[in-house]
């Protein structure tokens, strides 16, 4: 990197030469900015406030900010006044029942039990929980699908259908306890799932 003077054409005036021609303006500005080298005492004035502003003389002029009187009570401590109500969070409600690690989450109609809505997972957690529950059953294909993010939504729908078919086929479950995959033979549960 060369200096400015070597790159500038000979007819032009460089920044260094322009600064040398007019060293400082009368009001202390240089290139449109106030020049501050630590010497802020203006000429002709007798007393000036200190740079950091902690002098007692500056407080006597009335420019200093005074603390609030203690008569305001709770507002002086930074607490919210009782008249203002904070915004209420929207309660999350489920549209479809689902099972997550053995727990059944169903929609409660107009019940005051806010415990289930406060600790309930979000929709993504629902889908992941359904996929996780299906992979716990032992199907290898659904376990692979849980690893790929593109197929999470179709598997979640499949998991809902399989959960619903298992509930309907519960009394009719005379087949062995091995879980049936979507590609298995024609069983009542898989027939309902394909529909």
UniProtKB/Swiss-Prot annotation:
GO annotation (BP), single: central nervous system development
UniProt biased composition (Basic and acidic residues): 76-85
Biased composition regions of type Basic residues, renumbered to the chain: 86-98
Chief place where the protein resides: cytoplasm
Domain of life assignment: Eukaryota
One Pfam match: MARCKS
Keyword Transcription: no
Region Effector domain involved in lipid-binding and calmodulin-binding: start-end pairs: 87-110
Modified-residue entries (Phosphoserine), positions: 22, 36, 41, 48, 71, 93, 101, 104, 119-120, 135, 151, 162, 165
Quaternary context: Binds to filamentous actin (F-actin), but not to monomeric G-actin, independently of its phosphorylation status.
Similarity-based family: Belongs to the MARCKS family.
The protein, known as: MARCKS-related protein
Organism the protein comes from: Homo sapiens (Human)
